[in-house]
């Protein structure tokens, strides 16, 4: 009779700690994992795991290319990107492709090229993934020792870490090269309402770049998410790229110190948990950037931030009522505070009304109207430009509020509009992903630590319902 489960299934967590494991099949008897445990069957089959790794990369790149072309096919140049539910074209536009002054799309061909390049790349990766999953060697250690590894080999693991860091650093420098030499990037702060420009005067001062890390995450401080100019962003990429590349060289050329060998668990599942923890942090940071930052995520493409839409509403009605003869400097609202303008806790002149809570908003359409003490009354009377009025009216009606059924707008709005901001989608999806990756980090860290301590026996599978069903074969 075919043995439906193996006693090995009770230890494997990290099959590495199970010296009796015979390589060969990818079934439950030989790996300790059933088919539904997916790539866990490949923990000690470096060649097959490479296939899974490459194929996964192919799926990611295929999604990017296919979704990119889908957005190009549906794109309507007359409407802003954020009204069309786009999430990829805004990223390409932010990099300065296909857009001109004011964020107007002047050419969609670069977007088409991007989609096609990703599709072609995904085909290459897909072929490589299938090749290594089906045809290539099960393990790489014998035929290609450079690409082979053992999870316990601390020196090899830090070498692989170093290679990854160098590739990440090179990626950071690609964005620097784009901003400096290859056409520049879109700067929402360029005079007159934003434009593509080359970033020439990089911020390389470490006290400025790393000062962001020391800021409070709350209120007007906003930690790294508060970055509001491209000089700091691109300068930060220079620093980060350099740190990653030097760190990569360091990890390739050194062996882990004794404290590191003692502090870490050195197993495949432990590395998985470390990676999930890092990705979780990335997800939470990306969530905050997409929601609050209007420099790295220009409002021309992603729609206004919440505070920006609120301040835009106050500005729009100030403009309207001032034209109708209201004295916006002295008019009182129903609470006795200023109806249009009031003072912040620190004395600056700010917009009055409910939007007072967003008084520290900085936005390119509003900053020209500020003076040394907040909003400048004479500028509000004489200097408001038509593009500022148009933009604030547009932002006022596109707040990042909305529900899954696409009925956007404020909850009290009767004629709700069919609109959900890309900021809502991006912030929500990255927060949820970040949360689940964090749970995955805890789960796999717990299993890896238990296995390393030697008390992980897995779940008792004797009474697993699936074992009483008829085998598929």
UniProtKB/Swiss-Prot annotation:
Q: Which InterPro entries match?
A: PS_antenna-like, PS_II_antenna-like_sf, PSII_PsbC, PSII_PsbC_sf
What is known about what this protein does? One of the components of the core complex of photosystem II (PSII). It binds chlorophyll and helps catalyze the primary light-induced photochemical processes of PSII. PSII is a light-driven water:plastoquinone oxidoreductase, using light energy to abstract electrons from H(2)O, generating O(2) and a proton gradient subsequently used for ATP formation.
GO cellular component terms attached to this protein's record: chloroplast thylakoid membrane; photosystem II
Identify the Gene3D superfamilies for this entry.
photosystem ii from thermosynechococcus elongatus (1.10.10.670)
- A GO term for molecular function: chlorophyll binding
Q: What is this protein called?
A: Photosystem II CP43 reaction center protein
Its source organism is Huperzia lucidula
The record's note on quaternary structure and interaction partners says: PSII is composed of 1 copy each of membrane proteins PsbA, PsbB, PsbC, PsbD, PsbE, PsbF, PsbH, PsbI, PsbJ, PsbK, PsbL, PsbM, PsbT, PsbX, PsbY, PsbZ, Psb30/Ycf12, at least 3 peripheral proteins of the oxygen-evolving complex and a large number of cofactors. It forms dimeric complexes.
The biological process GO terms on file are:
photosynthetic electron transport in photosystem II
Question: TM segments?
Answer: 69-93, 134-155, 178-200, 255-275, 291-312, 447-471
């Amino acid at each position: 009779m075919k043995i439906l489960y193996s006693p090995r299934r009770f230890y494997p967590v990290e099959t590495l700690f199970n010296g009796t494991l015979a390589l060969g099949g990818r079934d439950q008897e030989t790996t300790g994992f059933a088919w539904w445990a997916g790539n866990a069957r490949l923990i000690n089959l470096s060649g097959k795991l490479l296939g899974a790794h490459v194929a996964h990369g192919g799926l990611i790149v295929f999604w990017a290319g296919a979704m990119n072309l889908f957005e190009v096919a549906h794109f309507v140049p007359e409407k802003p990107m954020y009204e069309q539910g786009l999430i990829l074209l805004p990223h390409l536009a932010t990099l300065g492709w296909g857009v001109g002054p004011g964020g107007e799309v002047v050419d969609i061909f670069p977007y088409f090229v991007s989609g096609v390049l990703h599709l072609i790349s995904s085909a290459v990766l897909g072929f490589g993934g299938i090749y290594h999953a089906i045809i290539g060697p099960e393990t790489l250690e014998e035929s290609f020792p450079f690409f082979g590894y053992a999870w316990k080999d601390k020196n090899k693991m830090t070498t692989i870490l170093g290679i990854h860091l160098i590739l990440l650093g090179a990626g950071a420098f690609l964005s620097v090269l784009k901003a400096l030499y290859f056409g520049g990037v879109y700067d929402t702060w360029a005079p007159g309402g934003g434009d593509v420009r080359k970033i020439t005067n990089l911020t390389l001062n470490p006290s400025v770049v790393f000062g962001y890390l020391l800021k409070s995450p709350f209120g007007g401080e906003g930690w790294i998410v508060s970055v509001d100019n491209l000089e700091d962003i691109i300068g930060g990429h220079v620093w980060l790229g350099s740190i990653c590349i030097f760190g990569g060289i360091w990890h390739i050329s050194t062996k882990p110190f004794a404290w590191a060998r003692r502090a870490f668990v050195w197993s495949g599942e432990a590395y998985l948990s470390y990676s999930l923890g890092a990705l979780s942090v990335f997800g939470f940071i990306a969530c905050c950037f997409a929601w609050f930052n209007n420099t790295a995520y220009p409002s021309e493409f992603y729609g206004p931030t919440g505070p920006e839409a609120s301040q835009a509403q106050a500005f729009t009605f100030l403009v309207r009522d001032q034209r109708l003869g209201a004295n916006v400097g002295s008019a009182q609202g129903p609470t006795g505070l200023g109806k249009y303008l009031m003072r912040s806790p620190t004395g600056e002149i700010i917009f009055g009304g409910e939007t007072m809570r967003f008084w520290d908003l900085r936005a390119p359409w509003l900053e020209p109207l500020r003076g040394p003490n907040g909003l400048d009354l004479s500028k509000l009377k004489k200097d408001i430009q038509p593009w500022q009025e148009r933009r604030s009216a547009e932002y006022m009606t596109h707040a990042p509020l909305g529900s899954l059924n696409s009925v956007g707008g404020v909850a009290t709005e009767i004629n709700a509009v069919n609109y959900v901001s890309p900021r809502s989608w991006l912030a929500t999806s990255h927060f949820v992903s970040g949360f689940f990756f964090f749970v995955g980090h805890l789960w796999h860290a717990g299993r890896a630590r238990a296995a390393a301590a030697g008390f992980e026996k897995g779940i008792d599978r004797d009474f697993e319902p699936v074992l009483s069903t008829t085998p598929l074969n």
